[in-house]
């Protein structure tokens, strides 16, 4: 059998096994199927991801799927499966099948989540522009940021917090402009007055309240992550790169100014770390945003300044983000030019809100839809 190296890890093409309990997420029917793994496409904190195909008869193959393998009988496995089983949204990766299998390598049982497969992550797309010393087109940044916010509108409406929003946890198809949030290994349904661990979310995208140890946080930590991802698309690198958790707060203070003592107290009264109370730059925070993100235009700067805010309750909600004027170009022009194309194509459908979304949007629906759609 031939081998291929993906992310430095060789994997035999054609490695296969029989799974006895392959359950369809759509029909709930369970059957015995052959699983043929093709190549490794990712590795996360809670498991690995391979591209694979499924078949009952070795003639009719289903896939390709992105199959995430995580140790069975863990709290994270249980949460991720529960969330993916109910999630049904164009900007959330779709679970197609799930099953368990005893690994011959370590004799442990693994949960396998077979999800739809998209060509690459947003991190890869950002890196491609950086490698070629190019800026990602502003239309693409609008398109991707909008879809992340729309996915969050749905998730947060369910009470689910992703808790690890970053470019490598967002899938994209650059040829169609479609984006889907993936990797729900850290996701959790937040309950009012129920504490959650603060050491969550990858450091560069961690909201300030998490850095100082808040355990009563809200889904607004995802909004902070969205702002970090948007900023990274604009400048080609993570905007806050602290080399350790507390230094991450210093990096944030370089852009936003020092955190308010009230914010510190209400996030975690027991916090006794550095406050970075002295200004780390001259001029205003507005000037700092303009220096770093000026090419996003006044609307882009305005949006970022309303997302990257210390106080969680002051960050824009998903519906207010979707209604922001930064996305007016998506409402006024329904085409974009994919990388490598010579002619523009239609944008993916951005305004086909279902009843659940419309209920959350309320009066904002008419502000978000293009006039011709709203009518």
UniProtKB/Swiss-Prot annotation:
Single annotated GO MF: protein serine/threonine/tyrosine kinase activity
Pfam families: Pkinase (PF00069)
SUPFAM superfamilies: Protein kinase-like (PK-like)
GO cellular component: cytoplasm; nucleus
Segments passing through the bilayer: none
Family the UniProt entry places it in: Belongs to the protein kinase superfamily. Ser/Thr protein kinase family.
Miscellaneous field: Present with 396 molecules/cell in log phase SD medium.
Name the UniProt record assigns to this protein: Protein kinase MCK1
Organism: Saccharomyces cerevisiae (strain ATCC 204508 / S288c) (Baker's yeast)
Gene that this sequence comes from: MCK1
């Amino acid at each position: 059998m031939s081998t291929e190296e993906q992310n430095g890890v060789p994997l035999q093409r054609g490695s296969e096994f029989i799974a006895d309990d392959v359950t369809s997420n759509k029909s709930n029917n369970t059957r015995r199927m052959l699983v043929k793994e093709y190549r490794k496409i990712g590795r996360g904190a809670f498991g690995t991801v391979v591209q694979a195909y499924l078949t009952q008869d070795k003639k009719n193959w289903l896939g390709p799927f992105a199959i995430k393998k995580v140790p069975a009988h863990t709290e994270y496995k249980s949460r991720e499966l529960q969330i993916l089983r109910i999630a049904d949204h164009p900007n959330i990766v779709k679970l197609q099948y799930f099953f368990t299998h005893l690994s011959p390598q370590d004799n442990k049982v693994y949960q396998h989540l077979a999800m739809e497969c998209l060509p690459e992550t947003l991190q890869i797309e950002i890196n491609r522009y950086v490698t070629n010393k190019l800026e990602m087109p502003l239309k693409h940044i609008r398109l991707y940021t909008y879809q992340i916010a729309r996915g969050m509108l749905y998730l947060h409406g369910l009470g689910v917090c992703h808790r690890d929003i970053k470019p490598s946890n967002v899938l994209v198809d650059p040829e169609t402009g479609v984006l889907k949030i993936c990797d729900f290994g850290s996701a959790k349904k937040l309950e009012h007055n129920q504490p959650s661990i603060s050491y969550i979310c990858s450091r560069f995208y961690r909201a300030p309240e998490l850095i100082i140890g808040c355990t009563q946080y809200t889904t607004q930590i995802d909004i902070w992550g969205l702002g970090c991802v948007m900023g990274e698309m604009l400048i080609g690198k993570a905007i806050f790169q602290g080399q350790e958790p507390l230094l991450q707060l210093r990096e944030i203070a370089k852009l936003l100014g020092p955190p308010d003592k009230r914010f510190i107290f209400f996030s975690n009264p027991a916090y006794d770390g550095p406050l970075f109370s002295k200004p780390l730059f001259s001029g205003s925070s507005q000037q700092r945003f303009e220096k770093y993100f000026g090419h996003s235009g006044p609307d882009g700067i305005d949006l970022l300044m309303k997302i990257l805010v210390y106080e969680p309750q002051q960050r824009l909600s998903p519906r207010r983000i979707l209604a922001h004027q930064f996305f007016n170009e998506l409402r006024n022009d329904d085409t974009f030019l994919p990388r490598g194309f010579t002619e523009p194509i239609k944008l993916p459908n951005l305004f086909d809100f279902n009843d659940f979304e419309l209920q959350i949007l309320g009066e904002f629906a008419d502000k978000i839809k293009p006039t011709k759609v709203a009518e």
